[in-house]
């Protein structure tokens, strides 16, 4: 969880390219987002019972993949009071052995959603054959917006391409994946045949992380020691000879 510093409300947070998987029972959840200006982008949710994610406030949910939920997937406010807004664009949902039902649920008319290009593979037959989710499967009766709310401008890929464009590199994939990440990626590629919820890390077939040997890569050249490799800085217009990692750019980063 992320807590505030007492100086104002949380906001302007992006969580991207992350694997959010295998929350432990009996509270196995992907995440509760109830602040404004939160972006969830190109993440992979696997083997979480619920909240993949649960959204309140004003937020955007773009190009995420969700696999094998049980009681809840994208929860639209949870029938809560207050007015909420979300852009949900280009997301892919694949049901697994836990069942899961519809990808979008928990709404009421106070939840306003701009929903475009969201697809679901519901039949758990081992074959990737999704369909575009119709408005009738956004359970609870949300209010559909005809245009997106103002949010951060993101490159958005078609949902049906995410297995090729996002899945191979999501998470800590360099120099190569650890056991846990390979395990959940393999579950996704089973298209409904593999997966489950766990209550302790040691129940996984490869043991707990403390049992693993460390995998090492080769450190990339970084002349100024600012954590950004020289090659990346040269390609992106920053100075590889100046320690400027903490400099705030004109775009706020």
Model-derived features with residue positions:
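Right-handed parallel beta-helix
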Residues: 1-25, 29-51, 58-71, 84-97, ...
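Aromatic-acidic/polar surface patches that form glycan- and anion
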Residues: 8, 81, 221
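Short, flexible, glycine/charge-rich loop motifs used to bind or transfer phosphoryl groups or to couple energy/partner
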Residues: 8, 108, 217-218
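Short acidic, glycine/proline-rich loop/turn micro-motifs
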Residues: 26, 75, 243-244
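Non-transmembrane alpha-helical segments in soluble domains
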Residues: 41-42, 185, 229
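Extracellular beta-rich repeat passengers
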Residues: 54-205
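Extracellular calcium-associated, cysteine-rich motifs in secreted modular proteins
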Residues: 204-253
């Amino acid at each position: 969880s992320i807590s505030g510093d007492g100086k104002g409300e949380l906001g302007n947070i992006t969580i991207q390219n992350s694997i959010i998987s295998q929350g432990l029972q009996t509270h196995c959840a992907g995440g509760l987002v109830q602040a404004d200006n939160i972006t969830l982008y190109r993440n992979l949710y696997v083997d979480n019972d619920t909240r993949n994610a649960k959204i309140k406030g004003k937020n955007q949910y773009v190009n995420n993949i969700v696999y094998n939920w049980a009681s809840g997937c994208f929860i639209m406010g949870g029938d809560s009071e207050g007015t909420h807004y979300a852009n949900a664009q280009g997301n892919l949902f694949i049901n697994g052995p836990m069942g899961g039902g519809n990808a979008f649920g928990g709404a009421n008319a106070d939840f306003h959603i701009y929903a475009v290009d969201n697809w679901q593979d519901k039949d758990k037959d081992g074959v990737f054959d999704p369909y575009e989710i119709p408005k009738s499967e956004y359970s609870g009766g949300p209010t559909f917006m005809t245009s997106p709310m103002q949010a951060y401008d993101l490159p958005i890929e078609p949902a049906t391409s995410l297995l090729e464009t996002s899945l191979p590199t999501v998470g800590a994939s360099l120099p190569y994946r650890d056991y846990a990440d390979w395990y959940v990626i393999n579950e996704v590629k089973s298209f409904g045949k593999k997966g489950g919820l766990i209550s302790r890390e040691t129940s996984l077939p490869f043991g707990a992380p403390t049992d693993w040997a460390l995998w090492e890569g080769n450190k990339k050249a970084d002349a100024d020691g600012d954590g950004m490799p020289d090659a990346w800085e040269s390609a992106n217009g920053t100075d590889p000879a100046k320690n400027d990692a903490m400099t705030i750019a004109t775009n706020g980063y």
